[in-house]
């Protein structure tokens, strides 16, 4: 079963709608909510890998498949894949991976993907390349 959860803090100085746009630029969510806490937290969810199709497309447009593959593979732990991108870059339609929350001053956008075959998910999102070109284009794994 596939489950994708994307979270982003909404800091007091931020416009909630802009945070939602930053998330929606790369993730087509099925449901969303705002949770209250130290910071408000925007939580978006989906139950299908097709919700990552925009992310898949932009990785190719920006020609960052090698870097993406490295970050994605590093984020696999058991049945989950976790990675973070820079929220302000996402708002303007750019993917910038971050290693820690400190690299994104207003907090990162955190993706958590649950799927039975995370290696296949990584191979679909960011296949191996040669001289910057994908060696193959894998189909999206089944949910």
UniProtKB/Swiss-Prot annotation:
Gene3D superfamilies xrefs: 3.30.1440.10
Domain of life according to the entry: Archaea
SUPFAM superfamilies named in the record: RL5-like
HAMAP family: UPF0201
Entry similarity comment: Belongs to the UPF0201 family.
Protein's recorded name: UPF0201 protein Msed_1787
Naturally occurring in which organism (per UniProt): Metallosphaera sedula (strain ATCC 51363 / DSM 5348 / JCM 9185 / NBRC 15509 / TH2)
């Amino acid at each position: 079963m596939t489950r994708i959860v994307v979270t982003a803090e909404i800091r007091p100085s931020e416009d909630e709608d802009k945070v939602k746009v930053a998330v929606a630029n790369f993730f087509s969510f099925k449901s969303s909510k705002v949770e209250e806490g130290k910071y408000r937290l925007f939580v978006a969810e989906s139950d299908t890998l097709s919700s990552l199709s925009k992310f898949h497309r932009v990785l190719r447009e920006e020609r960052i498949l090698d870097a993406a593959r490295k970050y994605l593979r590093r984020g696999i732990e058991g049945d989950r894949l976790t990675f973070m991108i820079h929220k302000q870059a996402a708002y303007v339609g750019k993917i910038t991976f971050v290693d820690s929350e400190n690299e994104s001053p207003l907090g990162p956008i955190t993706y958590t993907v649950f799927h039975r075959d995370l290696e296949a998910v990584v191979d679909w999102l960011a296949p191996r390349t040669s001289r910057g070109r994908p060696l193959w284009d894998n189909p999206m794994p089944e949910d």
